[in-house]
């Protein structure tokens, strides 16, 4: 393989590795506490605890129901907890609607929020992908 083909191949793999980061949307996350049923999407059907409620930004007239998102904490939204992030990401399923006035793009279950951030922060900056 000549140098130009090798360089092109290396650049392609590098860009492919960056693609998921480039497609991530930014927003904020808050959390809500149990009970998690009934929910707008599934009524009284229990969908576990790695769940979330969608704000108007992603609700899409119930089309968000069942969508899975990978959510990653990026940082604080206030001075209360300066470094809230755990360094982990969490995969959640949309099961509910966070009505107008919702304080976050995604309202995570308490368990999902605690997996990626200190709950004392209350609200965090996030990146999320489907």
Predicted features along the sequence, with ranges:
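Secreted/periplasmic proteins
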Residues: 2-130
């Amino acid at each position: 393989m000549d140098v130009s083909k090798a360089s092109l191949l290396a650049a392609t793999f590098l860009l492919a590795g960056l693609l998921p980061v480039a497609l991530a949307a930014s927003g904020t996350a808050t959390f809500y506490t149990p009970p998690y049923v009934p929910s707008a999407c599934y009524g009284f059907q229990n969908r576990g605890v790695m769940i979330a409620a969608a704000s108007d930004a992603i609700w899409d007239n119930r089309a968000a129901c069942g969508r899975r998102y990978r959510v990653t904490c990026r940082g604080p939204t206030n001075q209360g907890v300066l470094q809230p992030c755990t360094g982990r990401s969490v995969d959640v399923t949309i099961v509910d609607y966070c009505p107008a006035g919702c304080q976050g793009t995604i309202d995570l279950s308490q368990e999902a929020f605690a997996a990626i951030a200190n709950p004392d922060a209350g609200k965090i900056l996030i990146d999320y992908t489907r």
